[in-house]
Regions:
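C-terminal transmembrane-helix exit sites in multi-pass transporters
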Residues: 106-128
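Specific transmembrane alpha-helical segments of multi-pass solute transporters/efflux pumps
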Residues: 59-97
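Structural motif at transmembrane-helix junctions in multi-pass transporters
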Residues: 33-39, 86-103, 178-179
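Transmembrane alpha-helical segments that form core, pore/gating elements
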Residues: 29, 38, 52, 147-205
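Hydrophobic transmembrane alpha-helices of multi-pass small-molecule transport proteins
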Residues: 125-142
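Membrane-interface interhelical linkers
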Residues: 1-16, 49-75, 124, 187-224
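Membrane-interface helix termini and inter-helical loops of multi-pass transporters
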Residues: 26-37, 141-150, 201-223
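Hydrophobic/small/kink-forming positions within alpha-helical transmembrane segments
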Residues: 18-23, 53, 77-85, 107-112, ...
Length: 224
């Protein structure tokens, strides 16, 4: 597998993406008491669909749904969808700053997966930076195993799922272009969100007093 390396450009797009995610996460943190998790996910997906279609039309990109890696594509979609579900759920009981700090364990997982599945080499400087970051995550997690709050693992579960999704994205990018991969993500998110609406959208399972479970099972399309 070969690919053209353009690290500065890649870093720039990562920073822009993280900035957008930060705004989105802050909005979810602000409104989670009045909405359902997968209602928000569905709305997020519709906005993403609109922006992607507009961009592809403007740049004259062809819509191609075919994938050369059907199993990996399904796995990537599932990991991405439920990975960020873990993160959004964590915002109901921890600060946005802490959730993001724990999510930044993702470089550790990405590096391990890249070595195993992509055969990439990670130098000592990058390992040093990753290790330092992981120590920071460990400090934030504060694992007192006698009184450990396992709910803190949700952002780390998100980081692991995200890392698997990104590793698959890199692996399949030799035959599936970026637009095809994004379309697959949005198709998957749309289908899974609709399934959640069918089975939980009327709030029939929302008999919980806990804000986290209320966020997951709250009725869709209701105003507070």
């Amino acid at each position: 597998m070969t690919s053209v390396q353009n690290n500065p450009k890649g870093i720039l797009f990562i920073l822009l993406g993280m900035a957008v995610f930060s705004v989105q996460d802050a909005m979810i943190k602000f409104i989670y008491n009045d909405a359902s998790l997968y209602e928000l996910y569905f709305g997020r997906t519709l906005v993403a669909w609109f922006l992607l279609v507009c961009y592809m039309k403007f740049s004259k990109q062809k819509i191609n749904l075919k994938t050369h890696y059907p199993f990996l594509t399904i796995l990537r979609v599932i990991c991405f969808f439920f990975g960020f579900s873990f993160f959004y759920v964590s915002l109901t009981y921890m600060s946005l700053a802490m959730a993001n700090a724990l999510f930044f364990s993702s470089p550790f997982f990405v590096s391990i997966l890249a070595i195993i599945f992509l055969k990439e080499k990670v130098g000592i400087r990058r390992w040093s930076a990753i290790f330092a970051g992981f120590i920071g995550v460990f400090i934030v997690l504060n694992p007192d195993f006698n009184n450990f709050d396992y709910m803190k693992l949700a952002p780390i579960a998100c980081a692991l799922c995200y890392s698997i999704s990104m590793t698959i994205t890199k692996y399949t990018s030799d035959k599936d272009n970026v637009y095809t991969q994004m379309i697959h993500l949005y198709i998957g998110a749309t289908i899974i969100s609709i399934l959640f609406f069918i089975f939980t959208g009327e709030g029939q399972f929302n008999s919980f007093s806990d804000p986290t479970f209320q966020f997951i099972f709250r009725e869709w399309f209701t105003n507070p």
